[in-house]
Amino acid sequence: MAYLFTSESVSEGHPDKVADQISDALIDNFLAFDAQSKVACETLVTTGQVILAGEVKSNTYLDVQNIAREVIRKIGYTKSEYMFEANSCGILSAIHEQSADINQGVDRASKEEQGAGDQGMMFGYATNETENYMPLALDLSHALLIELANLRRENNDIKYLRPDAKSQVTLEYSDDNKPQRIDAIVISTQHDDFDEEATMLAKIKTDLVSILIPRIKAKYPQYAHLFNDQITYHINPTGKFVIGGPHGDTGLTGRKIIVDTYGGKGAHGGGAFSGKDPSKVDRSAAYATRHIAKNLVAAGICDEILVQVSYAIGVAKPTSINVVTYGTSKVNLTDGEISKKVEAIFDMRPYFIEQRLKLRNPIYSETAAYGHMGRTPETVTKTFSAPGGLTKTVEVELFTWEKLDFVDTVKTAFGI
């Protein structure tokens, strides 16, 4: 029997994502000037205020206020009527030195024996239902908001958009788990107060259905067949959405972990990513398991896979590695046997994850909105500034965990 599955996304202007982006901008700046920085940074944003708190061990000093303001400005909170504006918001920093008790569990005389920064379990997932090996409902949810942000910045076809927005896509699947069509789309977008409420809501719905949706179909032609005139659209279903962003809802780092990962498919160990340097396995091991999952599916080992890894704080070797293929395995091995091969191919000690995926680089700001997974690897040049006139220009590789660079190794190991 056919069934429905739903995933959601939030825009870069959503208050929780504003917090994530500030936290990750701080991570990038610390790593740019001191690649061995240990950082855990949490951000709270609310009406006219930003509060930074966390623990740092680093040889660099940063102007954290300026970094936060630049992030807020880039997102688009640049007008006083938003009640949260880059130049005027207050910024309080309570960032302090990392606990020596925690640091002793990570630092080792031998780099290779670097301990995990915490206990916990992390998951990576991949499926062949999309070209980027991501769940389709989440991919579409992200795509809607990326294009909505493009429309906002162009300020041409739609002129009233504000930064805060959410999306949700419901797909109908067939008995054999193949996506058939889009059943429902929900979009809530913040907007200017430009007319009577009923008039505004009617125009917003008309504009999104007649402008945004055709742009999505043109930009993602592989999804065009899923759109038809039977889709139920819920556009700003609660009514007008003028008050939004951090003024409408307080935002916190790490509150959108399902949006960040697989949209409810697979599993999640509970640890957030943003604001954490790669010694925190919540982040680095989640990237590493995604890398494993994607390469196994791309190699033809299975159609769908979930990879779990777990750690004890201060211990380098994982306490477990487990694989679930949901009955889609193409090789004559049990999931337990596949797990053993994965363990032999991929060294999951924290230092080796950092080296394999080049994680001690300032690569995290780009992850903090529209998902950490399913993105396109690319090499970019970035320039950072610090007090005293210091600048640092670096070339870095983004989204290394999305590379299909182990496909041949996997095929050889599995004899295919």
UniProtKB/Swiss-Prot annotation:
GO terms for biological process: one-carbon metabolic process; S-adenosylmethionine biosynthetic process. Its EC number is 2.5.1.6. It is an enzyme of class 2 (transferase). One of its GO terms (molecular function) is methionine adenosyltransferase activity. Signal peptide: none annotated. The keyword Isomerase does not apply. ATP binds at H14, D164, A165, K166, K240, F241, D249, R255, K256, A272, K276. Keywords: ATP-binding, Cytoplasm, Magnesium, Metal-binding, Nucleotide-binding, One-carbon metabolism, Potassium, Transferase. Pfam families: S-AdoMet_synt_C, S-AdoMet_synt_M, S-AdoMet_synt_N. Binds 2 divalent ions per subunit. It is found in: Cytoplasm. One of its GO terms (cellular component) is cytoplasm. Its cofactor is Mg(2+); K(+). InterPro entries: ADOMET_SYNTHASE_CS, S-AdoMet_synt_C, S-AdoMet_synt_central, S-AdoMet_synt_N, S-AdoMet_synthetase, S-AdoMet_synthetase_sfam. Catalyzes the formation of S-adenosylmethionine (AdoMet) from methionine and ATP. The overall synthetic reaction is composed of two sequential steps, AdoMet formation and the subsequent tripolyphosphate hydrolysis which occurs prior to release of AdoMet from the enzyme. Belongs to the AdoMet synthase family. Homotetramer; dimer of dimers. HAMAP family: S_AdoMet_synth1. This is S-adenosylmethionine synthase.
